[in-house]
Structures are given as C-alpha cells and as structure tokens.
Amino acid sequence: AGAKAAVLAEQAGGQAVAAYKAEERMEVGGLTRLPALLAVCEGIDQGLLQPSASVTVSEAAARIKGPTAFLSAYEVIDAASLLKAAVMILAGDAIYALAEAAYGSATACTQRAQARLSELGVEADYTELMGMDTRLSANDLMALGRALMQSPAFTAYSSLFYDGINHVDGRATELASSNRLLKTSVGCKGVATGSSASAGYCGVFSVTRGGAAWICVVIGAPNASSRSEAASDLIDYGFAAYEVKALARLVQVLIE
C-alpha cells in the first residue's frame, strides 16, 4: 500500500516471514520515542517507580512538543496516568516525566534506552530522550515492539483505543490512539503509531488470535488508512500461513 518499508514476524521468536527494505534505517516519526518508552516501562516493571507514586512534572517535561498529555510544569500527577498517556499516544511530556521519576534524570533514562537498543541488536545512536534524530529500520521497530509486548507495564494500557486522564486542577485530557487496528482487527493488543510530514505514516502492530501472535511494522505509508490497510493485510497473511502450517502438522500426525 505504498509503504517505504515493512516486516511481518512471529512475535514469539521474531522470525520474519515477509519483509520489504526491513533493514534500511529511515525516519519513523514519533516512533523514535519507543526506546525511551521501553526503558520507562521496564523500569516500572522492575520497581524503580510504583504506578501509584505521585510525580512532579518538570519544566523540561512540560516543554516537550508533539503528541502530549498537556502536562503543566510543577503539576503533580500519579505515575499510572502518565503511563497510560505514554503508552496510548506516545505522549512526550508523560514519557519524559516518567523517565525522570524512574531513573533520576532524562540523561540516565536515555543511557538505559541506548543500552537496551544494544541488547536488542539495534545499532542506532540514541543520544536524546525523544530520539529526535534517530533513524530506525522496520527490523529495529519489530525488536522494540516485541520487547514492549513482554512488559506488563506496557500491556496494561496498550489495548486501549480511547480513554483519558484527570489533572489535579480539574482539567481532563482525552487520549485517542491512532492505531485503528485496535478497533478493526480482532486480537490487536498494540503497539504504537507515529507520523510526520517527512516520515509518512508508520506503525508497529501486535495481534494475537488463538495460539498465534504476529507483529508487523509499516514505515512511510502515504496516509493513516493505507498504514492500517497494509498492516491488516500483513497480519491476515500471517494468520493464513499459520493455519496452513497447523493443518500440515495435523495431517502429518494423522499419517504417522
């Protein structure tokens, strides 16, 4: 559907069954925030920050542009609300506030994110928390998506399509995911979408049906609809192939 790159893989083992320019690093819009989000979610999983903890939003966090949770400097908000905004819409201010709360500073979280990228085999330079200048490949995004789907902190909110958070001053921020597959594809449990004028429409998608889970990445689709269409087609291809393999195994058992 006119994408610049794509990959489809079994989520458990990461074995790719379809790929197009999957190793080529390119602009991926807001998906450059995924390494920071992974570090934050895993930090919460490891107890560095309790979801019930109160977090004071710094001036630096409140200044972050792009998708945001409309946080104000010095606002006090629970970590769970920040996590919801971070996971659902990749809210940069929420990710930044969580990073500072869990790791003590944005720099420390950035270093952790870089270390996780290395562990995942992603050779990208990640020198700034939002990853503004980081280019990632479809394979890189697949590795990040697989890791995020193993994080309980992430999956607590990754299936939500529409929700919201409440601020202490009485304001409410609506959170609407751009991942249409959460509504249209049975078993979709995440992962994230992002876009920009130069990157096009990008996304990482995880779908589980029966005993199979597939993850796919689409980079550079011309619009949101074609991103969803490409992802749906890839996912459907994966499940069709899985059913053929399962049937072949059954036939083999019967023959034996």
Predicted regions and their residues:
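Penicillin-recognizing serine hydrolase domain
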Residues: 1-5, 105-255
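Active-site-adjacent loops and short helices of periplasmic peptidoglycan-processing enzymes
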Residues: 1-139, 143, 149-152
